[in-house]
C-alpha cells in the first residue's frame, strides 16, 4: 500500500503539541493590524487550540502527525 500524503496546506496551518492537541493561528492577524490595540496584536502571535469538535476534520489531513 502506498504512503498516505500529508496535505501541505494543513501542515502549514496546524501544529500538534506533545500532548496531542491541535493548535492553529488566530484569524484577522494581518489585514488592518495597526487599527487594532497593542494588546490585541500581541494576542495574534499566540496559537489557539482547535475546538474539539473540529479535530476530526484536521486529523485525516495530517496522517503522520499523531
UniProtKB/Swiss-Prot annotation:
Assigned GO CC terms: cytosolic large ribosomal subunit
Keyword vocabulary terms for this entry: Ribonucleoprotein, Ribosomal protein
InterPro entries hit by this protein: Ribosomal_bL35, Ribosomal_bL35-like, Ribosomal_bL35_CS, Ribosomal_bL35_sf
Record carries keyword DNA-binding: no
Gene3D superfamilies registered for this protein in UniProt: 4.10.410.60
MF terms in GO: structural constituent of ribosome
GO biological process: translation
SUPFAM superfamilies xrefs: L35p-like
UniProt family annotation: Belongs to the bacterial ribosomal protein bL35 family.
Name by which UniProt lists this protein: Large ribosomal subunit protein bL35
Species lineage: Bacteria, Pseudomonadati, Thermomicrobiota, Thermomicrobia, Thermomicrobiales
Amino acid at each position: 500500500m502506498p504512503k498516505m500524503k500529508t496535505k501541505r496546506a494543513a501542515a502549514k496551518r496546524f501544529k500538534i503539541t506533545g500532548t496531542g492537541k491541535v493548535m492553529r493561528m488566530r484569524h484577522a492577524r494581518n489585514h488592518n493590524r495597526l487599527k487594532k490595540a497593542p494588546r490585541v496584536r500581541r494576542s495574534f502571535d499566540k496559537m489557539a487550540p482547535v475546538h474539539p469538535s473540529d479535530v476530526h476534520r484536521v486529523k485525516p489531513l495530517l496522517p503522520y502527525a499523531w
